[in-house]
């Protein structure tokens, strides 16, 4: 490896986002209902138990010390909504979530309404 490549690699490593930054960005992306719908439908994440656990883990963003970093507070509403919708789902023998098949459909049918309501709350 050349000296220049080594220097570039070091610089890139120093610019990697922290776990905090990654999780903050992801939580805030939940305010974008079309993006959440994409994750659930196109990537089939609604069937993945790891995704359910990750959303549950992210609940700590509701704590005041973390919530103060949130620019899009509606993302916390969507996080809570998703965790509520996934509640009661179980993992079958194939390692796939069952009991949450309705989640993508709910977001597709009501997501636009929720986004409009979020915008209205911002205006108040």
Curated annotation (Swiss-Prot):
GO terms for molecular function: transcription coregulator activity. InterPro entries: Med31_sf, Mediator_Med31. Its main location: nucleus. It is found in: Nucleus. Coiled coil: none annotated. Pfam families: Med31. The keyword Protease does not apply. Keywords: Activator, Nucleus, Transcription, Transcription regulation. GO terms for cellular component: mediator complex. One of its GO terms (biological process) is regulation of DNA-templated transcription. Component of the Mediator complex. Belongs to the Mediator complex subunit 31 family. Component of the Mediator complex, a coactivator involved in the regulated transcription of nearly all RNA polymerase II-dependent genes. Mediator functions as a bridge to convey information from gene-specific regulatory proteins to the basal RNA polymerase II transcription machinery. Mediator is recruited to promoters by direct interactions with regulatory proteins and serves as a scaffold for the assembly of a functional preinitiation complex with RNA polymerase II and the general transcription factors. PANTHER family: MEDIATOR OF RNA POLYMERASE II TRANSCRIPTION SUBUNIT 31 (PTHR13186). This is Mediator of RNA polymerase II transcription subunit 31. The gene is SOH1.
